[in-house]
Amino acid sequence: MSSWNPGSPAGLPATQPATQPSGPTAAYDALLKQHVDARGMVDYRALHRSPKSLKRYVDGLAAVDLDALPRDGKLATLINAYNAFTLQLIVEHWPVDSIMDIPEDKRWEHRRWDLGGRKYSLNEIEHQVIRKRFDEPRIHFVLVCAAVGCPPLRREAYVDDRLDAQLADQTRYVHDHETWYRFDRRRGVLHLTKLYDWYAGDFEQAAGSVWKYVAPRVDGVETAGPKPDIRWIDYDWRLNDVNNGPEG
């Protein structure tokens, strides 16, 4: 299993200094370092006990001018916003065992999140803003819907000049961890996260097919013989809490 460093700019040369988040993003970055463990799981109990920093960041997103940001700055801000809004949702409904325990009308379709002076639902941010405006299938490995089956939450905020390295790091990790990827070489079966099923169109647009997108990203699949059968891993909707989740 390859290493994953969710708190450093993986993929950048060691000689290149890491850009530190500034302003409100710095406070969000500090919050993640404090409340997210090495597996990308969240200490919701502690976050619920000390909610002011998260609430301050979430409220501050109302003043963000997305149009003034460069492409990667805009995408980094949107990813941070989606993940922070989701954290806030869980904190407000704590304790819960799963995001699915939250009433449906309060979950992904609730248009309550102020981003740049406009109210969005979580689904609108993901599908109408991020997916519609950015040709970037790797966003499915960074948007965290508070479930164990989601990608891990990084212990740092996303920032514009390290965004590509952060996306690459998340993608590598997902394709090297059995929660999201398993290859049974003997049976010729490739088990993939349901994210590839739900968002197949995004991966097909990028590479022609899900298989063509996956194959270069995992060791040994392309040289293992005929194209394997693809099967979907059951999505784990348990809360991505420190008491749940994959082993480190």
Residue ranges and their predicted role:
Residues 2-248:
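Interaction/scaffold regions that mediate signaling and macromolecular assembly across diverse proteins
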